[in-house]
C-alpha cells in the first residue's frame, strides 16, 4: 500500500480548469439572458418564470445532439460553431409546434478538459441562444478520465419553450389544397454526417484543402445549422400556418409525414429548387441514389411549411423580410389508397 497522498487531479480531474471555464463563459451566458430568468450561474438549478403574455401557457421541451458532425469538427479543429448546431437542433424542433424557446442547457463531456476548446464550444452555444432569443441558463461540464480519446468530447442540449395552448401547431389543420413552402438550409445542418464522413473516406477528399465553388469543402460541410426561430415566429403571427416540418434525420420521407394527418399527402416538386453544391458533391462522390439522398439529407431544404393558398403571398413577403430564402416547393393532396405520404416529382 502506497503512502502517497492522492488528489482528484492525480486521477485526471482538474477542478481548477472547470472553475476557469466558468469564469471564461460568464460574459457569453450573460448576453443570452431573458427577463424571465432569475439568478445567475452557480445555483443547483436554474429558475425561469413564464412570460406574462401567455393566458394558457404550454411548455414544450426537446433534447438533441449534433451526431457525428462533431467528429468532423474535432478532426478539423473547428470548435466555434458546433455549439450553434447544438442549439439549432433543439430550438428548431420547438418552433415547428409554434413554441418560443425560453431556456437552454448543455452537457459537455470529455476525458480531459481543454478550457480553450470548451470555451469556443460554449461561445457557439451562446451565439445560437442569442440568435433564437433563448437564455443559456446552465449546463454540465463532465471531465471523465478514461472515457474518451484524447481531444474528443461529446455534446447534448436541452431546451424548453412555451406556446399558447390555442396556438399549438400540430398539423391537424392540414388539408388538400394547402401549399408547401420551403425554407433554404445553410448546408447539411447536423444530419447525415456518418454518410458524409464515409464519402470523404472513399473519395479520398481532404475537406481542409479541397475546394468547392471557390471555398474549402470544410466550409460547406461545417456551415452552422440555420436557426429559423425568429423568422417562423414572425410568420406564425401573420399567416395561418397549418404545419411545419423540420428536415432532420430521415430527410423528406420521414419528417414531413410526422406533421401530416393520416389522410394527407405532400407532393414535392424537385424542379422548384437546385440542390446546393455540397449535396451534388456528396451524391457524385458517394454514388448515392436519389432516394437515399432524400432520406439522409435535407438537400437544401431546412423546413417545409404548410399553409392555405390565400396566405402564400403574405408568407413569402414576411419570410423575405426576415432574411429567409423561401419558395413554393409543393402542395397537399388527399392520400390515395396504397400511396405514400410523400411524393417527390
Curated annotation (Swiss-Prot):
Subcellular location: Cytoplasm
Coarse class of the protein's main subcellular location: cytoplasm
Keywords (A to Z) from UniProt: ATP-binding, Cytoplasm, Ligase, Nucleotide-binding, Purine biosynthesis
EC number assigned by the record: 6.3.3.1
Pathway involvement of the protein, from the record: Purine metabolism; IMP biosynthesis via de novo pathway; 5-amino-1-(5-phospho-D-ribosyl)imidazole from N(2)-formyl-N(1)-(5-phospho-D-ribosyl)glycinamide: step 2/2
CDD domains: PurM (cd02196)
NCBIfam families in UniProt: purM (TIGR00878)
Protein name stated in the entry: Phosphoribosylformylglycinamidine cyclo-ligase
Organism field: Actinobacillus pleuropneumoniae serotype 5b (strain L20)
Amino acid at each position: 500500500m502506497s503512502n502517497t497522498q492522492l488528489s482528484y487531479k492525480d486521477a485526471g480531474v482538474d477542478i481548477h480548469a472547470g472553475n476557469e471555464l466558468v469564469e471564461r463563459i460568464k460574459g457569453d451566458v450573460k448576453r443570452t439572458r431573458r427577463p424571465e430568468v432569475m439568478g445567475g450561474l452557480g445555483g443547483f438549478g436554474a429558475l425561469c418564470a413564464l412570460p406574462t403574455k401567455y393566458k394558457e401557457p404550454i411548455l414544450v421541451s426537446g433534447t438533441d445532439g449534433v451526431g457525428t458532425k462533431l467528429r468532423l469538427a474535432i478532426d478539423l479543429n473547428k470548435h466555434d460553431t458546433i455549439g450553434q448546431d447544438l442549439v439549432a437542433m433543439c430550438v428548431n424542433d420547438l418552433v415547428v409546434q409554434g413554441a418560443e424557446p425560453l431556456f437552454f442547457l448543455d452537457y459537455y463531456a470529455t476525458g480531459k478538459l481543454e478550457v480553450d476548446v470548451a470555451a469556443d464550444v460554449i461561445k457557439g452555444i451562446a451565439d445560437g441562444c442569442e440568435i433564437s432569443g433563448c437564455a443559456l441558463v446552465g449546463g454540465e461540464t463532465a471531465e471523465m478520465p478514461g472515457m474518451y480519446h484524447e481531444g474528443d468530447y461529446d455534446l447534448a442540449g436541452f431546451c424548453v419553450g412555451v406556446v399558447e395552448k390555442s396556438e399549438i401547431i400540430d398539423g391537424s389543420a392540414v388539408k388538400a389544397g394547402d401549399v408547401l413552402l420551403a425554407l433554404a438550409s445553410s448546408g447539411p445542418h447536423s444530419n447525415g454526417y456518418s454518410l458524409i464522413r464515409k464519402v470523404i473516406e472513399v473519395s479520398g477528399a481532404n475537406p481542409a484543402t479541397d475546394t468547392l465553388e471557390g471555398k474549402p469543402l470544410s466550409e460547406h460541410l461545417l456551415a452552422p445549422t440555420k436557426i429559423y426561430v425568429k423568422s417562423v415566429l414572425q410568420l406564425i403571427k401573420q399567416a395561418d400556418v397549418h404545419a411545419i416540418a423540420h428536415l432532420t434525420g430521415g430527410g423528406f420521407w420521414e419528417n414531413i409525414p410526422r406533421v401530416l394527418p393520416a389522410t394527407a399527402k405532400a407532393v414535392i416538386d424537385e424542379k422548384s429548387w437546385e440542390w446546393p453544391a455540397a449535396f451534388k458533391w456528396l451524391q457524385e462522390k458517394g454514388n448515392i441514389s436519389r432516394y437515399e439522398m432524400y432520406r439522409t439529407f435535407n438537400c437544401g431544404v431546412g423546413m417545409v411549411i404548410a399553409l392555405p393558398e390565400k396566405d402564400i403571398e403574405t408568407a413569402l413577403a414576411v419570410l423575405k423580410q426576415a432574411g429567409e430564402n423561401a419558395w413554393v416547393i409543393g402542395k397537399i393532396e388527399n392520400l390515395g389508397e396504397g400511396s405514400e405520404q410523400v411524393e417527390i416529382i
